[in-house]
Amino acid sequence: MAKVWLITGSGNGLGRDIAEAALAAGDSVVAGARRTEELAPLVAQYGERVKPVTLEVRDEAAAKAAVKLAVDSFGRLDVLVNNAGYGKFEPFEQMSAEDFQAVVDTCFYGVVYTTRAAVPVMRKQKNGHIFQVSSVGGRLAAAGNTPYHAAKWAVGGFSDALAMEVAPFGVKVCTLEPGGIRTNWARRAGQNTSDLLPDYEASVGSMLKMLRSLEGRAEGDPRKIADVIVKLSNSDEVPVRLILGVDAETRVKQAEAARAAEAEKWRHLTVSTVFEDGLFDSRLNMAKGSSGSGSHP
């Protein structure tokens, strides 16, 4: 059966590719964008299967209206893709509070608002898929993009917990964590930055240079990512988190190895904070005994 999608940030970039892939699969799409005129070619090609909607994800009322449009137009909502987002490369010290808040509001609260509007519909249907387009930046960080990383780490934690809450009534939540994607994201993230204070040249300055050098050369193919999302939307089993791209996989492995090494280095302080009543030793022994059983605390 054809599905009904709501996709945020579908005017261009990855969101546009996701919308095109869903429509090519025979599904219907409520396509959210700040400028709906960008969606005119989709309407011309797919007609009534596309419902453009002006959607500023930082506006909770607009998120509710977009979900309502899906239900009113097609009778249900099967797939939500929270794709809208952007980054801003600038030292935290030099970034205005307004710019910081705008990134967090878009990349995190935008996800919260559309998800909050969609969950009641999916709960009543007893099915649905929610895809959060996060980033490898939700597992690791780079200098110069503090609000983006703050938001993406928040999306991961929020979605992990949400997945547990909604699983009993058939709703699947998957956080997608791509590496570099060949879109205009990097160019936009490096625009309108202040002149760096000299002290930040070694950290933020080097990241900006690398970002600009990779423009148009990122490994991630947005059309292939869109195809993966369409495939998962038709599956009864989805991962809670999915890394996308060899570059992302490599960086995550490096970050996890570095964290494990740091944790081991400072373990003497970690274990120094417990009561000395014998419980620590017994819990440690229990953990060792269950390490191969697949059980969880």
What is the meaning of each model-derived region?
Residues 115, 151:
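Active-site helix of classical SDR
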Residues 91-92, 99-101:
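Substrate-binding pocket helix/loop in short-chain dehydrogenase/reductase
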Residues 135:
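Residue(s) in the substrate-gating loop at a strand-loop-helix junction
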Residues 48, 69-82, 88:
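A glycine-rich helix->loop->beta "capping" turn
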Residues 55-65, 97:
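The beta1-alpha1 cofactor-binding region of Rossmann-like NAD(H)/NADP(H)-dependent oxidoreductases
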